[in-house]
A protein has these predicted regions:
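N-terminal cap/lid segment of alpha/beta-hydrolase-fold proteins
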Residues: 3-41
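Cap/lid segment of the alpha/beta-hydrolase catalytic domain
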Residues: 37-111, 159-161, 165-166, 304-317
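Accessory cap/linker subdomain of secreted extracellular hydrolases
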Residues: 64, 72, 136-252
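Catalytic cores of eukaryotic secretory-pathway lumenal/extracellular enzymes that build
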Residues: 79, 123, 128-131, 139-147, ...
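Alpha/beta-hydrolase fold nucleophile elbow
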Residues: 113-126
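C-terminal, loop-rich substrate-recognition/catalytic regions characterized by aromatic stacking residues
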Residues: 196-215, 303, 308-404
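Short beta-strand/loop motif that positions the catalytic acidic residue
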Residues: 253, 259-261
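Active-site-adjacent alpha-helix of alpha/beta-hydrolase-fold enzymes
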Residues: 269-291
Length: 404
């Protein structure tokens, strides 16, 4: 199949403004880095809202191109620290402010000098969540979003898995990222040092019980990570979680979406549900038709780019598996934000998927692929399947009682 051709630096020169303030509806000021192209006319905005620090948009050579690269293609690129993180003011609480702050930031960015009023968003993982949560508020100037590796719900597939708390993901992730960076933002060196040390030995904390008194996240101090303990206090899918569910709000999303997922990504199921949910329930006919998902042989971290490094998981597959993401994003934004003709957008729902083993790309119009046959598989063993070298089996045939 044909991807858009690999694209070098664009024609526009770029300047960067650091820590540009944006005032939210409650008066909190969030800070963004703004990459300005030297264009002679107003240009669209590409926005990223991140909890990992604005500089993180520049340091993933196996993932996205840099903000300056996108800006060189004559876009005004805005990378903002979300509330309570990095240079931004306010108090961080996982997901709680991302819908309203996302709406306010989209409208602020649309009114920036040099903007033509059209805004697209991009980003992966939590930075995909900041897009969806903004989109369900339907800001008038949001035209499209491009989320990657992000689930459809922040209870199922993120914090819990079929009712089981995702300890091995949640604890180290919070210690090493959102709780740590929020402590830096608050200027609390004691908590920063404690979290840094705990994250360095994250595996040793996986055996700690009970979760509700987990020492590294300081249950006695609500400034550290109150969302961790609130999540434990809400082990079922109740109103706490429904506030920021994506799957429950597809009918409020009015924009086309370019989705990216990987076969080895922890959030694959949710990403695919976002695609099928938008095709079925998007707020408008144009939104339902304007869905495209690309599912590659990638994990959550490295997609690989032909002009940088291969994703580690792809080293035995070769360049056929390298990511077309940046060129697809650029073509997608060119179509929806600049009105340019495109063969990759506007033709109805599309699924591009990499067939593992055969190492080929395919395109279809629906998921599951039309004609898919489902097969039930059964776990079995002779009683010694409790190690990686055990005698466990996976068979399409049901085993008789006793393992025979």
């Amino acid at each position: 199949m044909g991807w858009p051709p690999s694209t070098g630096t664009g024609p526009c020169q770029v300047t960067k403004q650091a820590d540009v303030p944006a005032r939210m509806r409650d008066g909190t000021v969030l800070k963004a880095d703004v990459y300005r192209p030297t264009a002679h006319e107003a240009v669209p905005v590409i926005l990223m809202r991140t909890q990992y620090g604005k500089a993180s948009a520049d340091v993933q050579p196996s993932r996205y191109q840099t903000p300056a690269w996108f800006a060189s293609h004559c876009y005004l690129v805005v990378v903002q620290d979300i509330r309570g993180q990095g240079a931004s003011g306010g108090t961080f609480y996982e997901y709680a402010n991302d819908a309203d702050d996302g709406y306010d930031t989209v409208e602020w960015a649309a009114a920036l000098p040099g903007s033509n009023g059209k805004v697209g968003m991009y980003g992966t993982s939590y930075v995909g969540a900041t897009q969806w949560l903004a989109a369900i508020r339907t800001p008038p100037h949001l035209v499209t979003i491009v989320p990657a590796n992000t689930p459809s719900d922040y209870y199922q597939n993120w914090t819990y898995e079929d009712g089981a708390f995702r300890l091995a993901f949640i604890e180290p992730w919070m210690m090493d990222t959102i709780a740590l960076s929020a402590a830096r933002q608050r200027g609390n060196p004691k908590i920063v040092a404690e979290l840094t040390e705990a994250a360095r030995n994250a595996a040793s904390w996986e055996h700690y019980r009970p979760y509700a008194t987990f020492p590294p996240l300081h249950p006695e101090d609500p400034s550290v990570a109150p969302y961790f303990f609130d999540a434990i206090r809400h082990p079922t899918y109740d109103e706490y979680w429904k506030r920021w569910s994506i799957r429950g709000h597809y009918d409020q999303v009015t924009v086309p979406v370019l989705h990216f997922e990987g076969w080895y990504d922890a959030f694959l199921a949710g990403g695919m549900e976002n695609f099928t949910g938008m095709v079925a329930h998007g707020a408008t006919a144009a939104a339902r038709a304007g869905q495209r998902i690309v599912i590659g042989p990638w994990d959550h971290i490295g997609w690989g780019r032909p002009d940088s490094i291969e994703a580690p998981i792809l080293k035995h597959i070769g360049s056929v598996a390298n990511s077309p993401i940046n060129e697809l994003m650029l073509a997608w934004f060119d179509h929806y934000l600049k009105g340019q003709p495109s063969t990759i957008a506007g033709s109805g729902p599309t699924v591009d998927y990499f067939e593992m083993g055969a190492n080929r790309w395919h395109s279809t119009t629906a998921w599951p692929v039309p004609g898919t046959r489902f097969t039930r598989y059964y776990l079995g063993s002779g009683g010694h399947a409790n190690t990686s070298t055990g005698d466990g089996t996976l068979s399409p045939q049901a085993l008789r009682a006793g393992g025979g």
